[in-house]
Amino acid sequence: MEESGVIEVTVKTLDSQSRTFTVRGEWTVKQFKEHIAASVEISVDKQRLIYQGKVLQDERTLTEYNVDGKVIHLVERPPPQSSQPGGGGGGVSGSSGAADGGSSSSQSSAYTTSHDRNANNYVMLGTFNLPVNIMDPQQIQMSVQQMLAGVGEMGRNVRVSTSTGSSGSVDVHINVDQSVQSEPRMRLHLAENLLRETQALIHRLEGQSSEPSQQETPPPQPSSSSFSAHPMDSSPPPPSVSSSASQTEGETQSGPNHPSPLELVEVLSEVRRVEERLRPFMERTHSILGAATSADYNNNTQEREEDQRTLNLIGESLHLLGNTLVALSDLRCNLSAQPPRHLHVVRPMSHYTSPVMMQSGLPHIPIPMNLGSTVTMTSNSRQTSDGQPQPPHSSNQSDQQGQAPPTPANESNQQTGHGQGTPRVIRITHQTMEPVVMMQMNLDGTTVPLHVPGLPPEFMQAIMHQISQQAVTMATAASAGHQGQQQGTAGAGAQNGESPVPPPPQARVVITRPTLSPRVPQPMGTRGTTINLRAAVPPPSGQQTNQMVSGLVGQLLLPLHTGDQTSTTSSSHSFSFSTSSSTSSSSSFSSASPPLSSANTSGQTSTHTTSTASVGQAQESGPGDNLAQLLGSLLGGAAGAGGGVSGATPSITVTVPGVPAFIQGLSEFIQSGQPVFPSPNQQPPPSQATPPSAPSGPAPTTAPSGGAETLSPELFTGIVQGVLSTMMGSLGAGQGNTESIAQFIQRLSQTSNLFTPGAGDAVGFFGDLLSLVCQSFSMVDMVLLLHGNPQPLSRIQPQLTAFFTEHYLQGREPTDANIASASEDLINELEEYIAESFSTVTVREGVDIIQTNMSFLRQQFTRMATHILRCTDNTFGQRLLYLCTQGLFECLALNLYCLRGEQRALTTVINHRIRRMSAEVNPSLVNWLTSMMSMRLHVILEHNPVTEDQIQHYVIYTQSESARRTEAGSQSSQQSQNMNVEEGLSPAPATTAEEALRSTGDTDGDEAPGRPSAEETRGAVAMATTEREESTGEAEPWAATVPPEWVPIIRRDMLTQRKMKAQPPLSDAYMHGMPAKRRKTAQGEGPHLSLTEAVSRAARTAGVRPVTAPDSLQGELETPELQEAYAQQVKSDIKKRLSDDPDYNHQRFPNTHRVFSEDA
């Protein structure tokens, strides 16, 4: 064919650029790669050509693949595994550096060794699924590869593969190798970065052209808090950021490339030069501070601002310079070693980072967070000792520039020791701990995508500002009461090391931020993360605060939820997140950072590998998709549950999906000490989950802390408001955090009537109530409610009271009769919707699920309405929150019982209701809601504190089942039968609310032990609205498959069939003529002697209601005298019937006279 001819091939790279090459057809793929290497700026050994889903082999010719006139896709790949140290290092530092435009995290030693994908240096990040109709699997793979290629060295050291799953989704697998890094070199890199930032500050001090607007808050962070390794430049880091990193062509070893002592000398010389430049400004600072106490600027605003700017910049400079010295202080040179000697670290440090170079001049560019970075926070109430050096491979764990240690000697994960009078140190740093990948999907489409930006610079800055201020407050407030309370906790987890260095005599906060990868594609969407929380045994109460702040920072930046684990053994869990426990008292969280490392941390006594599956994605397809993705990032889209390991005495928190992600780290903080808002007569639960879980461990060991760690809800509110306000701003909201949920959803869904009262598919009262709640609550309010804070409910008490008075009572007085009547009318209107909701599932035999739900809803809503209309004290919000959460738990448990314990059936019912009421909502959002609800519901049901026994009194049985149960109870004696009735085992088929309240009155005294407290019910409120919404909506799956005119007919027939009464019990005459075997199975249907049932039937038949309270009537019907009189009346009536009925034959019923004889 064209074997010797010329062919034309188009090569399309991941940056969407196409290049056409005219080459000879007999060329091999290897020759073609060499030909295009200069144009595409990718070395031959890193080119991967893909055509029709197949990778072109180097030894085959282009003609064999028939690529003439076709398009070949080119992606980058890591060098072959057989690459040698010299060649590999040269390749990386050469062409790859040019391709990436220079990365601040590029290390020339990254590929000095070959990587065994089956060894410990290989970590499986996890997988995620995408709908198959989004794009071609090959295109997805290329997009992922493109994203990874832009995040530095680590991005080029990955394998991306895709496969189509059986469920119709595209499985994207990302595999990342770990690279070897020198810890001493990271110290030098860190010192260089800090010195460069210090010089930038000095340059601003020396120059007079700086904008005055920057004097109070420099772009990277506020001056009111201490940050180790934070950005000060507004320009991207230069490619030569690692100036001391020597090339590895001459290396003979396959391990880390350790720096020589001469490199340390250069850095120390630079430190001296920086100090000299800083000296005149130090003198100026001395003079300013000397007169600061009583200085009067006489309205000289310019002079005052200039002095303030000098103080701020000098403070930041000293902080950077101090951290530089700390970073260099652990570098040593062993002169007794054989030359050539190199530097080593005497105290290994697991927390590294380098400055973030913020694009403050380009506010639309989000901050590219590092992959694999970890936020770690440690609290010390006394002197600490360093951890032991890690096993040899643990030196590979920190694959980034370095980090500014917050304290001179205890930068490892500390094990607290004894000491008195030492302050509290809160440290928030970023650590390369877990490899995490954030995903960016660029989808082609004709619709204009809804712009959901990533993390702009001001977002990160505001978060750090908010957290630092709150952390300082917490550290200062709790330092006094925290002294000496954690004695003797070293135990099995104590670490041996250097003598501790006394910290300064006041609480301080050190916050660091990760490095920038300049070529991360923009904009970035949601980011995945892994949370690692480690605690000593028993965990100090100060740990609660640490986890709160750490989790808050982490979850805000990269939404996923935490696995909290407290145990005495070192273990690891991996399920869309990573949980590890150790003997160190720190909590860490993984955010994004290009480098990669092993899962071991300094201070741990055993090794383990943890993997993450926290892969986020940004889909720019349409408003609905972006909204679904955005809500997923806010509410926590990934699943996971972390439990405790046996042998641990602290509380074991079960972490579940579906919680707004960033608040998971706050759960421990809220639980510390006593409950923030304990319910009356409720004891703190043994454990708590969000959403709630059953008690799964012993009581928490937070008693020694007393009230020292119990922080006020105002602090919690302040943190959430500050951070959420910033988040809403980054999502395009206006200034402040006053945007309601309705406004938020309407803005993102581009609709105007989604929550308009009376509009859309809502149903009357409940639709208006939902609109009121969504228009009154903000995102901050929902966070507070999820954690048991009733303040938002208390705030809208006037609106709720007015709404219920107008729409519920129609202006009538809030008497018991009026409230019960309104509840009856309101719930009766829901019968059709309840019937439709359960039309497609199988109900437990003998249970009338429609009447059961209606009776339950009447009782619950009557209680809530009574409380809303009558409560006037400060317990309004607390009690209402409890009623809502308790009602939700009982509703789930009740319906799960009625559905034979099948969670799938209950999930189907709820999702069916969501889809029906979301007919006008974007289908992508609906799909997301249903999948999220399924995930949440599964875990909530697994840990529902309400048991089947506690909801039995709500169950209403069909007529035949009720009769069977009554007869079974009456076989022994009338007393036992009455007892069964009192226990609520067999209410009538259509028991009214008044009758059902009988069981409630009997069990009120016994209900308290089974009720979850406000702590247990946190998180369930989020589903309460969804449960209420079950009563709304019109669409059904089958309705779309039949002609429209048949829909009302079929629906009416369905309701008619459900309302048909069961066949009454067979008569004695009929039973006598049946075969013996069949007669035996049908026996047990005795007479109905229940007075309650008789009165209920009579009232329903006559259409009347009691004039007194239901409880009063119930009590009167259950008096022994009345029951006995009723039994005698029934007996008398039967005797009269037997004597007057001409068809009665005593020979056919020989035993009747024993009960109904004249003398009986």
Swiss-Prot record:
GO annotations under biological process? brain development; chromatin organization; endoplasmic reticulum stress-induced pre-emptive quality control; ERAD pathway; internal peptidyl-lysine acetylation; intrinsic apoptotic signaling pathway in response to DNA damage by p53 class mediator; intrinsic apoptotic signaling pathway in response to endoplasmic reticulum stress; kidney development
Q: Where is the Ubiquitin-like domain?
A: 7-82
Which cellular compartments is it found in?
Answer: Cytoplasm, Cytosol; Nucleus; Secreted, Extracellular exosome
Q: What's an example GO cellular component term for this entry?
A: BAT3 complex
* Keyword Cell wall biogenesis/degradation carried by entry: no
Q: Which GO terms describe its molecular function?
A: misfolded protein binding; polyubiquitin modification-dependent protein binding; proteasome binding; ribosome binding
Output compositional bias ranges, type Gly residues. Answer: 85-94
Q: Per the record, which residues fall in region Disordered?
A: 76-114, 206-261, 367-422, 478-547, 563-628, 672-711, 962-1038, 1126-1160
Pro residues composition-biased segments:
677-698
Q: Which PROSITE patterns match?
A: UBIQUITIN_2
The Basic and acidic residues compositionally biased stretches are 1132-1146
- Keywords, in A-Z order: Apoptosis, Chaperone, Chromatin regulator, Cytoplasm, Nucleus, Secreted, Transport
Residue spans of biased composition, Low complexity class = 95-110, 223-233, 478-495, 566-614, 699-708
List, as start-end ranges, the regions of compositional bias called Polar residues.
Answer: 247-257, 371-417
Pfam families in the record: BAG6, Bag6_BAGS, ubiquitin
Q: Subunit structure of this entry?
A: Component of the bag6/bat3 complex.
Query: What job does the chain carry out?
Result: ATP-independent molecular chaperone preventing the aggregation of misfolded and hydrophobic patches-containing proteins. Functions as part of a cytosolic protein quality control complex, the bag6/bat3 complex, which maintains these client proteins in a soluble state and participates in their proper delivery to the endoplasmic reticulum or alternatively can promote their sorting to the proteasome where they undergo degradation. The bag6/bat3 complex is involved in the post-translational delivery of tail-anchored/type II transmembrane proteins to the endoplasmic reticulum membrane. When nuclear, may also act as a component of some chromatin regulator complex.
Instruction: Please identify the protein, giving its name as recorded.
Output: Large proline-rich protein BAG6
- What is the species of this protein? Danio rerio
